[in-house]
Amino acid sequence: MLHAKIVDIKEKKISLSDAEKFISSNSYGASIFFTGTVRNQNNNKNVVGITYDSHDALVIKSFQEIYNEAEKKLNIDVKSVFIEHAKGYLNLGEISIVIAVACKHRDKTYLLSRYIIEEIKKRSPIWKKEHYLNNKTSWLKGNPIINEKN
């Protein structure tokens, strides 16, 4: 079971209670919540906020592909996964992503949660523009949408 969504923060904030409700079930003995938040330092620069942009349809597709791949690669057939990523400007400490995972056992839950966040960072077309204390901004280097072959 998968919930995958891009959240426009002008309309709604990411909700941990929504994640908890989605993954709650008597079928699962373990659950994990991963939250990514805006931190105040990156590459020795004082960050005050981040603007996230994304290609929403491709992001959702990548979330679904990652979920489906995980089932095969990690051999986890009974699971519930909730993924939401913010789009728009976030202040320090605000949640940019939540990944909630529930499985029968804790080992698979940890494994699946880690797999999902690492694959999202590698593959999902989500871009970050950092806003600094000195009023400057910078788009961070991301990954290409299409894998280039040499």
Task: Please provide the spans of the model-predicted regions.
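N-terminal, polar/charged subdomain of small-to-medium soluble alpha/beta proteins
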Residues: M1-I95, A102-R114, E118-N150
